[in-house]
Amino acid sequence: MQQKQDIKGFTILELLVVITIVAVVSAVGYPNFMDWRLDREMRASMEKVSSMLRSINTQAQRGNFSIVQFMVKPSSNSTEFISKGMSKSAESTIANTSGQTVTCRIVTSGYWTNQQVEYSNNDVATNIDANGAVCFSKDTRYFLKEGKLSSLLNVSIEGRLTSNYIIICTTENATKSGGKCATNQLDGLEKPAYLVEWNRFGNISKFKWGGSGWSRL
């Protein structure tokens, strides 16, 4: 004779306990997940900027362009990053024309041989609230800055001051600082934030904001 199996389901109380536990775990874990996601987004944008700077400098070193430009074009909710190049013949024409000098001109047409070598649009903010650009050349003869990148405040990195950088932070953080990323803790810079530094030789360095200072990556 087959015995009856004593099979019981969950009681309403047990289900409520399980639901409560899941809710508590979710409430604790969700903020951490959001922080992680934001950090990944900021870091990805920083890596893109770093890659674009290295790439355009490599093209200058190879002689593809005589002068190259990295341009930052911020808007209210995103930032465009654009690299451009000027051919040797175009640079020579400007340099040899009376009354003209080679500059890091910010334009949307003309002047540059290639107006868009590389382009990226990211939902991030930077430490500038209007267009800015930096230009490099193979022989370091040209190391020029234009627009907002020509008048940056010095920031302290590894015990030294530099004005050759771009900071990437969330648009929410930038809103608290007048529409652009702050440059230090006192002015309101918050995590996650990243910084890309360059020099006239085209060397690129990357840093992460730790809450009170910059750490090299």
PLM feature spans:
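N-terminal single-pass transmembrane signal-anchor helix
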Residues: 1-38, 42, 52
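G2-box/ATP-lid motif of Bergerat-fold
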Residues: 65-68
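N-terminal helix-rich module
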Residues: 28-35, 39, 47, 58, ...
